[in-house]
Curated annotation (Swiss-Prot):
One GO CC term, this protein: plasma membrane
Signal sequence range: none
Family: Belongs to the fluoride channel Fluc/FEX (TC 1.A.43) family.
Record-given protein name: Fluoride-specific ion channel FluC 2
Entry binding sites for Na(+): G76, T79
Role according to the record: Fluoride-specific ion channel. Important for reducing fluoride concentration in the cell, thus reducing its toxicity.
Pfam family, one: CRCB
Gene this chain is encoded by: fluC2
GO molecular function, one term: fluoride channel activity
Source species: Ligilactobacillus salivarius (strain UCC118)
GO term, biological process aspect, one: cellular detoxification of fluoride
Length: 129
């Protein structure tokens, strides 16, 4: 049995609850958009996690249980590396797979960077008030 020390029940419940939301959102998008949905959720998730980290969490605007629930639970369940990998393997040509990989990795990095910059800038604006 895995023993976890210093984990609060509220945090576990938060990760569970927000994980259900993130997983459900990903599932609904995948029904509508197939493999395009995987790229979309991973790109959106990259932005959201960076924004959460650099604005909400770093500024400690939310209690720890809520920021963990949103980041690890919702964004973690919303994004998916395993589906990303299976989608790449299912593409018919090397060119398609390469394009998918590049859009996902480069786009994810750029959106995470954008989320970070936006979070930092909004944090500085909020500090002036």
């Amino acid at each position: 049995m895995i023993e976890v020390q210093n984990v609060k029940l509220g945090t576990l419940i938060s990760v569970f609850f927000f994980g259900m939301i993130g997983g459900t959102l990903r599932y609904l998008l995948s029904l509508k958009l197939a493999s395009t949905g995987t790229i979309l959720v991973n790109l959106i998730g990259s932005f959201c996690l960076a924004f959460l980290t650099y604005y909400v969490i770093e500024r400690q605007k939310l209690p720890a249980w809520l920021s963990t629930g949103l980041g690890t639970g919702m964004v973690g369940a919303f994004t998916t590396f395993s589906t990303f990998t299976v989608d790449i393997l299912g593409l018919s040509t090397f060119t398609d797979a390469t394009f998918y990989l590049l859009i996902s990795v480069v786009g994810g990095f750029l959106l995470a960077y954008t989320g970070m910059i936006l979070g930092i800038k909004l944090g500085k604006v909020g500090d002036r008030r």
